[in-house]
Amino acid sequence: MRAEIEALAQDIRRSAALLKRHLNWDEALMRLDELNASAENPDLWNDAGAAQKIMRERNELDSAIQGCRALERELADLAELIELGEMEGDQTVIDDAEEQVRALKERAAKMELETLLSGEADHNDCYMEINAGAGGTESQDWAEMLLRMYTRWAEKHGYKVEWLEESAGEQAGIKSATIRILGHNAYGWLKTESGVHRLVRISPYDSAARRHTSFSSAWVYPVIDDTIDIQINESECRIDTYRASGAGGQHINKTDSAVRITHIPTGIAVACQMERSQHQNRARAWDMLRARLYEAELQKREAAAQALEDQKTDIGWGHQIRSYVLQPYQMVKDLRTNVETSDTQGVLDGDLDMFMAASLAARVQGQVDQG
């Protein structure tokens, strides 16, 4: 086996060992046996909430255990295949197997990174709000570019995207939008994207072709299920109904059924306009508000994070997390981790994993450093 491939094999073995340590392997195997026994209990579904919790834990633990075993099994199979190819002098077999080792290394690295997603709500679906900053059409166009960037990222990772609210810009773009991203670890990955995003480019809306700086924000909070009890006093909320203001098309329900709920004590406001009836929009908006209040509580409990609403000051120079420069040169730079790339088009097409991974690792390291 060539030195390069042997080094990759060692990396895969290290990743598998780390994953096993993270799981507390022996304890994880015993816990899975317990969960499997519980799942076979005919009385399990007498308590639907408890049953869902058990089944969710079982599925996640089984997936993690099988993932570790698959790494070790596939690496052993590929090593045998390479050895066989070398014995028979079949370079095609060797080349194919080595390519599979490289792909396995990438998979192992991703699995290792996902061990960092251990927060209380990291495995949940999430809501994402995009809001344009000051600057009119420029910022509104940038907000729509951000929305496209995140939907492309979600599609590349096999996540489903639901549109909940969209407010069209005056000439182009959007003033705001809210989407729901459904998939395992959606919140864990996207929580690193909350903050202000800055764009520098030659404006397509400026006849003098001058360079403009625009700001838009992304705010992410987890979808919560019925096992998490968030009490809301309805007397502390204001409910408004209005006509949907989006541009129409597949995402917007153009009726008078849109609903906005404002939680007066915190100032948190949510809106939904995508369902067909006001009743449905109202129910979805209450779910969104519960999720926002839960996220605010999570932020208070996390030593490494500030309270969510304290972050939401004016969308401008403060609280920037990333800068996107398209002219006079091309560079996207994360201001928290200093990770950067000149592939601006790739980033705007949803290639965000390098930024998310670095930010997630830095956040976890910060929690370790703080105690």
Swiss-Prot record:
In terms of InterPro entries, this protein maps to: PCRF (IPR005139), Pep_chain_release_fac_I (IPR000352), Pep_chain_release_fac_I_sf (IPR045853), PrfB (IPR004374)
Matching Pfam families? PCRF, RF-1
Listed GO CC annotations: cytoplasm
GO MF annotations, alphabetized: translation release factor activity, codon specific
What keyword terms does UniProt attach to this protein? Cytoplasm, Methylation, Protein biosynthesis
Q: Give residue numbers for the modification (N5-methylglutamine).
A: Q250
PTM:
Methylated by PrmC. Methylation increases the termination efficiency of RF2.
Q: Which locations, inside or outside the cell, does it occupy?
A: Cytoplasm
Q: Which PROSITE patterns match?
A: RF_PROK_I
Intrachain disulfide bonds = none
Q: What is its main location?
A: cytoplasm
Matching PANTHER family: CLASS I PEPTIDE CHAIN RELEASE FACTOR (PTHR43116:SF3), PEPTIDE CHAIN RELEASE FACTOR 2 (PTHR43116)
What does this chain do?
Peptide chain release factor 2 directs the termination of translation in response to the peptide chain termination codons UGA and UAA.
| Family of the protein in this entry | Belongs to the prokaryotic/mitochondrial release factor family.
The protein's name is Peptide chain release factor 2
Q: Which organism is it from?
A: Paramagnetospirillum magneticum (strain ATCC 700264 / AMB-1)
The organism's taxonomy opens as: Bacteria, Pseudomonadati, Pseudomonadota, Alphaproteobacteria, Rhodospirillales
Quick one: which gene encodes this?
prfB
